[in-house]
Amino acid sequence: MNANRKSLEDKVAVITGGARRIGACIARTLHHEGMKLVIHYHKSAEAARELQAELHHHRPDSVLLVGTDLLDPAKLEKLVSQATAEFGQLDVLVNNASSFYPTPVGQTTDEQWDDLIGVNLKAPYFLSQAAAGPLTVSGGCIINLVDIYAERPLKNHPVYNVTKAGLIGLTRALARELGPEVRVNAVAPGAILWPDGDVDEIAQQRLISRTPLKRTGNPTDIAQTVLFLVRDAEFLTGQIVNVDGGRSIVP
């Protein structure tokens, strides 16, 4: 270990949507560095309990699970207060939870709009607002998970695209609002994990063919980038880090 590298031992992170997929990989990575975790989940209770048991096997009493609906503003403040009540501080907020599904123009409902905006943009804002106080005390940071589709819109997903573009704007705005005590950055994944459900293999291969590295990434690529932003990037704020195999540079 680099002697000059900041230790994350006993630091505390809240990770939304941390029970599965990329969120779980981020949780494992930060926990491996000695952090205590508050893992939020909504409908993935079984996966959350399995992950907690796995992490507690390595370090007992280091993970708190909080199941809640991010569409309920009152519960967002409670999520932060539960973290500080359990572990006494908050050092990192990872806004990872996200809803993703098509909303073709002409077929989008009010409910879909409210759900996507609520989970992908409103919740990160109000969680960040609730966390700003303890993060200011600890000199901590916020990491938002955005998407390369924020700037390269995905067809038939206009509302999702808008939410991620908004989250990029929020990342930069919060960096100005909360600095110098709190750093705020974002990670924009490319093709890492395909969405749950039906998979269009032709579309997958088309995307990979337009990626300079000619392959997909994996959740560890995202988790290691989050770790870098948390631990090593002390002079970085308001930045969006694309982890996409170069897809964002290809027309």
Positions of the model-derived regions?
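Substrate-binding pocket helix/loop in short-chain dehydrogenase/reductase
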Residues: 104-105, 112-117, 207
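Alpha-helical segment proximal to the catalytic Tyr-Lys
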Residues: 133, 175-180
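Short C-terminal tail/terminal secondary-structure segment
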Residues: 2-5, 152, 227, 231-251
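Active-site helix of classical SDR
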Residues: 128, 163, 171
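A conserved structural motif in NAD(P)-dependent oxidoreductases
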Residues: 211-222
